[in-house]
Amino acid sequence: MPTVKHEFDFGRIETRPKQVTPEVIRAVCERIVDKVNPEKIVLFGSRAKGTASKYSDIDLLVIIDRKNPLALLKGRDRYGQILRLFPHRGFGLDVIVLTDEEVHNVINKNEGEWDLILEILNEGKTLYEQKA
């Protein structure tokens, strides 16, 4: 999937609610790719379903390699590291960060507690995937 770099200055976004456009979503994805080097990014929630309002948040599942430095952190700390990439963003951003191994375990050993992740993987929109 070819990517086009969009210049977007996250340091200059005001704190009031900002409309989330496709350009903003692309810029968020590109920044995560540049700074985190994920294996995959999946958009989910109202934006993936097409039911979002112009001020709806961005929901992302970010899958990282188990050797990625973020993999050493707990889930909420991984989330915090992603949010630090977007100071003064002016829009809601919810991110679930899992390792490839955690995703594999969810798929193969799910006992109901990970149904949301399975739904995201099945119904979400892939925004980025590393080339093999």
Task: Please place each PLM-identified region on the residue numbering.
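Short beta-strand->loop micro-motif that forms the acidic, two-metal-ion catalytic signature
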Residues: D59-I63
